[in-house]
Amino acid sequence: MDVHDLTRAPPEYLEVVWVTDVCKLVMAVGWLSNYIGMIAKSIKEQTYSMALMPLCCNFAWEFTYFFIYPYKVPMERNIHTLAFLLNCGVMYTAVRYGAREWGHAPLVQRNLPVIFVVCIACWVSAHVAFAEQYGPSLAQAVSGFACQILLSAGGTCQLLCRGHSRGASYKLWLARFMGSFALILPNMLRYKYWRDDHQYIGSPLYIWFLGMFLFLDGSYGFVLWYVRRHEREQVLVAKPKVQ
């Protein structure tokens, strides 16, 4: 799969393509740092960082565009290879420690590995169906946006439902946000200089995706601050008062 075939690119875009390459590297640093940080955080605190359903959707997306519709551009292929391998580590920690977070739901707790397998299989089938319907290039981009929205919403909901910040940190949030935010400028440049092949970037759906990403991921930072403030208050309440 060649997401952005530069042989089709107009000269105006080729003049600024270096900007998109720099942004891709920023994206890679952000997301790879996020994956490494999630693995380390999960092992240290014996939990998992990414919400269950977004994790399965994201892993399925990585799997689909690593094995079934692989990238042809060397830089993108190498970045995606590292991302997939690290995502395997994220998935391992989720399976290894996930049951600790589901004591309130014994059915889920006992069957978590099966739930992960079924969810990943379902999401892979969805990504493949979308790619076959609309073509891998467009499907890769649009389904990637959908993964991001699900991840942003799922992360915020996970914080609210758990009521604690184990598995979460400002560094993980900022790395993820930076990695995704870095792709906005390349999309703007493609829409401005290479519009024929990137009409979807100016569509109402893409604008909605962008707005929801900024709102949901921005909200995550506020919710994390609120949860941590509540944790500090609980610690103070639990401390015995000195007579």
UniProtKB/Swiss-Prot annotation:
One of its GO terms (biological process) is terpenoid biosynthetic process. The keyword Transmembrane applies. Coiled coil: none annotated. Its main location: membrane. One of its GO terms (molecular function) is lyase activity. Keywords: Lyase, Membrane, Transmembrane, Transmembrane helix. The chain crosses the membrane at residues 16-36, 50-70, 79-99, 112-132, 141-161, 172-189, 207-227. It comes from the Eukaryota. PANTHER family: PTHR42038, TERPENE CYCLASE AUSL. GO terms for cellular component: membrane. It is a multi-pass membrane protein. Its EC number is 4.2.3.-. It comes from Apiospora sacchari (Arthrinium sacchari). Pathway: Secondary metabolite biosynthesis; terpenoid biosynthesis. It is an enzyme of class 4 (lyase). Belongs to the paxB family. Terpene cyclase; part of the gene cluster that mediates the biosynthesis of the diterpenoid pyrones subglutinols A and B. The first step of the pathway is the synthesis of the alpha-pyrone moiety by the polyketide synthase dpasA via condensation of one acetyl-CoA starter unit with 3 malonyl-CoA units and 2 methylations. The alpha-pyrone is then combined with geranylgeranyl pyrophosphate (GGPP) formed by the GGPP synthase dpasD through the action of the prenyltransferase dpasC to yield a linear alpha-pyrone diterpenoid. Diterpenoid pyrones display various biological activities and subglutinol A shows insecticidal and anti-HIV activities. This is Terpene cyclase dpasB. It is found in: Membrane.
